[in-house]
Amino acid sequence: MENPFVYGEVVPGDAFVDREDELDRLVSDLGNGQKVFLISPRRYGKSSLIRQALDALGRRGALTIDLTVSSYSSYVAFLEGYARAVATVESKWDRARAWLTEAIGSTRPEIRYEPKDTGGGRFSVAFPHATTARDVNRLANDVFALPGKLAADRKRTVVIALDEFQAIDSFNGGSVEHALRAAAQRQRQVGYVFAGSEPSLMEKMIGPRRPFYKAGPVLRLNKISHTLFADFIERRFTKSGIRPEQGVADAIIDLAGNLPYDVQRLAHEAWDDVKARGARKVTLEDLHHTLARLLSEQETIFEALWQRLTLHQRATLRAVVMQGGREIHSADARERHRLGAASTIQKSLAGLTDQDVLIKEGPRYLVVDSLLREWVARRTF
């Protein structure tokens, strides 16, 4: 029996939790050619939601393209990956090469098929002649026009997902935003989802002074209902032949901070531990043994992170954990945790947020990794 809980990869349909309303809205908007902004903190299941939406649209006949912007090292590399993804969607090598050459021949792309020793191969696109800023801007206009040409040529809806979209800021973001917005707004048969896991950056990108202001609907992911998540965990355990003790599902959600990634991780690891012993029931004691194992395995990583923090950042992080992320600036919290001036606290909070240790959710600060939160809580200072 395969482990029924999935983490560390895009979650498949049968292991996907809730999000029916968000999924229905995303599928409907993208199928109608909308340009959707999907904003979500890390570990909320954004990428899995996108995958579910693309799969649903693909079954309806749409051509779907999925790119992760942060995986590219430069603007030109991103444009090369973008062109390759559009040209090769449901296309064989010869057809893709001919289509792309005709579509952007003026930019003189180098198009190759690189076979692998194990069979199959990879279609590669390079733009070696894009050497100046003017060349790159011209190239961007040609590449960003490709989805519209593909939709017209195939007479099918095209849907493009650009995950970790906030990473375009590292590619001279303003220029990219202008070029992409200009192309996208002319493509009625192309749906876009611009998805990002850094809410503050994404909110700025759709602000009044940015090209994507009012470009399309905005979908913000919130946490999954505790009750729905608990029901899911209990069903998945039971269906796999392992009976959860009363309270186990609730404990998993609480220990994991109700973060979808962390919930799936803790449930997955607990299932593995119980299965390895040949048991047919998972108990609260089993869960805490699993948690202790995971903390032990992460000890070196967390200790290295801790050593990188300033003394005040350490104190602030511990205060966030002990206060549940609330009222960190209050006089009581400042005195109890010896945090000093409010301005110093704010500087440490900003530094911890920049390092992806904390995230701000409404008035609260939360530790991004629930295991790190538990590790900090268990340390003696």
Please give the residue ranges for each predicted region:
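A short, basic N-terminal segment
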Residues: 1-36, 41, 359
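C-terminal leucine-rich, beta-strand-based interaction scaffolds used for sensing/assembly
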Residues: 2-3, 152, 247, 292, ...
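P-loop NTPase Walker A phosphate-binding motif
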Residues: 41-67
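Conserved phosphate-binding/catalytic loops and adjacent sensor/switch elements of nucleotide-binding enzymes
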Residues: 58-149
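Conserved Walker B catalytic segment
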Residues: 126-198, 207
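Short regulatory helix/loop adjacent to the ATP-binding pocket of P-loop NTPases
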Residues: 199-216
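Conserved AAA+ ATPase "SRH/arginine-finger" region at the nucleotide-binding site
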Residues: 217-228
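Amphipathic alpha-helical "lid/sensor" segments that cap RecA-like P-loop NTPase cores
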Residues: 230-300
